[in-house]
Amino acid sequence: MPEPGPRMNGFSLGELCWLFCCPPCPSRIAAKLAFLPPEPTYTVLAPEQRGPGAPAPASAASTSSASAAAQPAPQQPEEGGAGPGACSLHLSERADWQYSQRELDAVEVFFSRTARDNRLGCMFVRCAPSSRYTLLFSHGNAVDLGQMCSFYIGLGSRINCNIFSYDYSGYGVSSGKPSEKNLYADIDAAWQALRTRYGVSPENIILYGQSIGTVPTVDLASRYECAAVILHSPLMSGLRVAFPDTRKTYCFDAFPSIDKISKVTSPVLVIHGTEDEVIDFSHGLAMYERCPRAVEPLWVEGAGHNDIELYAQYLERLKQFISHELPNS
C-alpha cells in the first residue's frame, strides 16, 4: 500500500493510482478493495491423515476436533481421494471455539470443486435436525470457517435452522485466489453441494450473505429462486463503497449487486446498521428500495459494521421473518 498523501473521497492520490492502475481491471480492483483472508484457523484431515502413525493436530490444548459423520451420495466423493463423509475438523486457538466437543461433533466438513477448478472447503452445521430450512451462509471478508463455526452453532440453534457455509477461494482450506469470478463460482459449487449431498431443495434454502458475502448471495439469488434471501450489511458495488458519490455502474466497477437485486424473485430481508463505518447505511437502503420482493427491513440504530448481531432486534427479526413471513412457514 502506498504512503499517505493528499486524499480524495477517503483515498490518497497514491492509493488511487495503486487501486486503478496496477493493473486497471475490475478483478484486481475488487481484490484490493474487498478481500482480507486471515491466516487459516482450522485444518481438515482426510481419513488416511488420521490413521495409525499419522501426525496429530498441533496439541490437545490448542485444537478441537470434530468427525464429519454425514454420508453423502455416492456421486459426491471427497476431493483429494478421501472417502465420503470421513473428514475431520481441527480448530486452532484463534478460532475461539465457545462450545463443547458434543457441539463440535455436529459439524461436518468436506471438500467440493468449483467450475473454476478450485477446491472448496465446506461446512454443514446440524443445529436443528427437524428444521425445514437451511441457511446457505456467505461470510464476511476477514474471517474463515474456523472463526465462524461457533457463531453458526449459536445462530442456528436460536433461529431453528441448519447452516451450510463455505470458504471463498483463497480462504481457509479453499485453494485458489480470491476474486470476483471465483466468488460466483464458489457459491455455485456450495449451492450444488447443499442440494446434491444433503438433498435440500431450493424451497428450503435461505441464502444469507454478510458484507462481501452479499455479493455472491445476490448473484445466485438473481439466477435461482429459493425460500428467502437475507442481506446483512450489503453493498451496492465496489466503486460505490470506495467513492460514495458514484451514481452509476461503470464498466470497470466490481460487485455490481445494485444492478442484480431487481432480478431477485425470492423474499428479501435487508439488515444494516445506521452507523456502519465500512459500508455506509445508504447501501442497505438503496438495495432495499431496488428489491421487488423486499420485506420490512431491519435498520439497527447505532450499530456499526461488525456488531449488529449483539443487538436483541437482530435475532428477533430473523425469527419473525423465518417463522412467520415466509410463504410456507
Swiss-Prot record:
InterPro entries: AB_hydrolase_fold, Hydrolase_4. Residues 46-85 are annotated as: Disordered. It catalyses: S-hexadecanoyl-L-cysteinyl-[protein] + H2O = L-cysteinyl-[protein] + hexadecanoate + H(+). Hydrolyzes fatty acids from S-acylated cysteine residues in proteins. Has depalmitoylating activity towards NRAS and DLG4/PSD95. It comes from the Eukaryota. The active site is at residues 211, 276, 305. Palmitoylated on cysteine residues located in a cysteine cluster at the N-terminus which promotes membrane localization. Palmitoylation is required for post-synaptic localization and for depalmitoylating activity towards DLG4/PSD95. Belongs to the AB hydrolase superfamily. ABHD17 family. The keyword S-adenosyl-L-methionine does not apply. Its EC number is 3.1.2.22. Residues 51-79 have a biased composition (Low complexity). It is found in: Recycling endosome membrane; Cell projection, Dendritic spine; Postsynaptic density membrane. This is Alpha/beta hydrolase domain-containing protein 17C. GO terms for molecular function: palmitoyl-(protein) hydrolase activity. It is a lipid-anchor. GO terms for cellular component: dendritic spine; endosome membrane; plasma membrane; postsynaptic density membrane; recycling endosome membrane.
